[in-house]
Curated annotation (Swiss-Prot):
Its main location: mitochondrion. The lineage of its organism: Eukaryota, Metazoa, Chordata, Craniata, Vertebrata. Proton-coupled metal ion symporter operating with a proton to metal ion stoichiometry of 1:1. Selectively transports various divalent metal cations, in decreasing affinity: Cd(2+) > Fe(2+) > Co(2+), Mn(2+) >> Zn(2+), Ni(2+), VO(2+). Essential for maintenance of iron homeostasis by modulating intestinal absorption of dietary Fe(2+) and TF-associated endosomal Fe(2+) transport in erythroid precursors and other cells. Enables Fe(2+) and Mn(2+) ion entry into mitochondria, and is thus expected to promote mitochondrial heme synthesis, iron-sulfur cluster biogenesis and antioxidant defense. This is Natural resistance-associated macrophage protein 2. Changing residue 338 to A: Abolishes N-glycosylation. Does not affect endosome targeting. Impairs sorting to the apical membrane. Residues 1-40 are annotated as: Disordered. Changing residue 351 to A: Abolishes N-glycosylation. Does not affect endosome targeting. Impairs sorting to the apical membrane. Changing residue 48 to T: In a colorectal cancer sample; somatic mutation. It is a multi-pass membrane protein. Ubiquitously expressed. Expressed in erythroid progenitors. Residues 23-40 have a biased composition (Polar residues). It is linked to Anemia, hypochromic microcytic, with iron overload 1: A hematologic disease characterized by abnormal hemoglobin content in the erythrocytes which are reduced in size. The disorder is due to an error of iron metabolism that results in high serum iron, massive hepatic iron deposition, and absence of sideroblasts and stainable bone marrow iron store. Despite adequate transferrin-iron complex, delivery of iron to the erythroid bone marrow is apparently insufficient for the demands of hemoglobin synthesis. The keyword Cytoplasm does not apply.
Length: 568
């Protein structure tokens, strides 16, 4: 049965707990109102994370564009763009250059553009509703799917955190010329994270400026490597704008798939939808909402353009200097330059395989110690900035899905402990190759979690009761559905290839069992999404006891007043 706006619901329904029902909730009359219901600032005062300070937007006469307003909206997009520059992305970039040369730059460009479109949806959800993605999921999905979804997103955040720990530990090891062991670098990342998290006590704009400083460090360090190596500009442009991959075989194809998985991060959708709430926007005023959407999109374009250029620096450096190189050639150069790392590479004619650690070493062998240390500084900046945004993502997700407020200190202790323990064990009992090899597994993990961000964001931004006049149009719904399907398919291929290479029967059995459960849940989310996109014939109504209405625009959002959100 579908409840009308006039019907009252139980306390459990208001809190978002629908028991074991498989369906989403019913419509919230606040969202069905064509005028956006929430006034600026209401129902948001209980948020403690990141929102202790609101940035006001300057009042100006109506104009098509204002630099003052763009500056006021600048911040969330650059914090979001950090996920496009984390150590996992940097490793994917350098491997892409070493394995395929410049041939996959167009894949990087395409993945970044797709990421921009998805970030646009995330930002619009936060601006229009005043709720971030985790909060909307908490209010709309039944209890069991909601908990599973939360666990999947938490897994993605922890996996990302492990990549950041690995990157920072390797950077510290390189900067100390090996004096600080990898396990020591892992421990150092615990302390520095807490130090950086206290920066937001000094004001939101100062925190955003610090992130801008870290992005600048990455641009300068990786830009230095680009200028030093002097890659062919014609090859860079050809690789970027000519979509071809002549001579590409399985390693190059797998690397292309890996680029997509590394660039589009699941937790980033949750992060961006929350960060945009830090600006004062009167959601009763459609013009202000439309203006906020416009400036946030412009800022996201600028931020992702910067991140794309930095990624191009890394790909181009390794494409120019190390594409087609063999281990024997590298050993010879490292020996001639008296590098202490010459023994890191086998003396054979196999193609050079690089990672974050070996990448710094070969740069030092070919272009001098300065190139190695500057590379390490860039990796350290990538690891530290990603650590901080990952912590915010975890806090938003936990508060939104569980309706539970934790202090940042407690949140960091929990997440970082889970990420540190396996990383520390590998750092202590194995070598750097095993530590950097964890990145491959973690990239697979991130790929597996993508549907749990992409499907919900497309579902909710396509529903008029949620987004009012700002819901996705038919073109966006079709394009979004196709993009989500393609991205999920690409990443599933990446996972299948990884599992195939494991080569152990027991692991195949485990993978098969997990895959059945995984695909079943993805099917459930996809089914709900298709109904939201307008395919009401998929709603089997009362015959399946799912409680969905045949009218897709009326089946979402619980009957509760938007101003009476659950206190945390």
């Amino acid at each position: 049965m579908v409840l009308g706006p006039e019907q009252k619901m139980s306390d459990d329904s208001v809190s978002g707990d629908h028991g074991e029902s498989a369906s989403l909730g019913n419509i919230n009359p606040a969202y069905s109102n064509p005028s956006l219901s929430q006034s600026p600032g209401d129902s948001e005062e209980y948020f403690a994370t990141y929102f202790n300070e609101k940035i006001s937007i300057p009042e100006e006469e109506y104009s098509c564009f204002s630099f003052r307003k763009l500056w006021a909206f600048t911040g969330p997009g650059f914090l979001m763009s950090i996920a496009y520059l984390d150590p996992g992305n940097i490793e994917s970039d350098l491997q892409s250059g070493a394995v395929a040369g410049f041939k996959l730059l167009w894949i990087l460009l395409l993945a970044t553009l797709v990421g921009l479109l998805l970030q646009r949806l995330a930002a619009r959800l936060g601006v229009v509703t005043g709720l971030h993605l985790a909060e909307v999921c908490h209010r709309q999905y039944p209890k069991v799917p909601r908990v599973i979804l939360w666990l999947m997103v938490e897994l993605a955040i922890i996996g990302s955190d492990m990549q950041e720990v690995i990157g920072s530990a390797i950077a510290i090891n390189l900067l100390s010329v090996g004096r600080i062991p990898l396990w020591g670098g892992v421990l150092i990342t615990i302390a520095d994270t807490f130090v950086f998290l206290f920066l937001d006590k000094y004001g939101l704009r100062k925190l955003e400026a610090f992130f801008g400083f870290l992005i600048t460090i990455m641009a300068l360090t990786f830009g230095y490597e680009y200028v030093t190596v002097k890659p062919s500009q014609s090859q860079v442009l050809k690789g970027m704008f000519v979509p071809s991959c002549s001579g590409c075989r399985t390693p190059q194809i797998e690397q292309a798939v890996g680029i997509v998985g590394a660039v589009i991060m699941p937790h980033n959708m949750y992060l961006h939808s929350a960060l945009v709430k830090s600006r004062q926007v009167n959601r009763n005023n459609k013009q202000e909402v439309r203006e906020a959407n416009k400036y946030f999109f412009i800022e996201s374009c600028i931020a992702l353009f910067v991140s794309f250029i930095i990624n191009v620096f890394v790909v181009s450096v390794f494409a120019e200097a190390f594409f087609g190189k063999t281990n024997e050639q590298v050993v010879e150069v490292c020996t001639n330059t008296s590098s202490p790392h010459a023994g890191l590479f086998p003396k054979d004619n196999s193609t050079l395989a690089v990672d974050i650690y070996k990448g710094g070493v070969v740069l030092g062998c070919y272009f001098g110690p300065a190139a190695l240390y500057i590379w390490a500084v860039g990796i350290l900046a990538a690891g530290q900035s990603s650590t901080m945004t990952g912590t915010y993502s975890g806090q938003f997700v936990m508060e939104g899905f569980l309706n539970l407020k934790w202090s940042r200190f407690a949140r960091v202790v929990l997440t970082r402990s889970i990420a540190i323990i396996p990383t520390l064990l590998v750092a202590v009992f194995q070598d750097v190759e095993h530590l950097t090899g964890m990145n491959d597994f973690l990239n697979v993990l991130q790929s597996l979690q993508l549907p749990f961000a992409l499907i919900p964001i497309l579902t909710f931004t396509s529903l008029r009761p949620v987004m009012s006049d700002f819901a996705n149009g038919l073109g966006w719904r079709i394009a979004g559905g196709i993009l989500v399907l393609i991205i999920c398919s690409i990443n599933m291929y990446f996972v299948v290839v990884y599992v195939r290479d494991l080569g152990h029967v027991a692991l195949y059995v485990v993978a098969a069992v997990v895959s059945v459960a995984y695909l079943g849940f993805v099917f459930y989310l996809g089914w709900q999404c298709l109904i939201a996109l307008g395919m009401s014939f998929l709603d089997c109504g009362h015959t399946c006891h799912l409680g969905l209405t045949a009218q897709p625009e009326l089946y979402l959002l619980n009957t509760m007043d938007a101003d009476s959100l659950v206190s945390r």
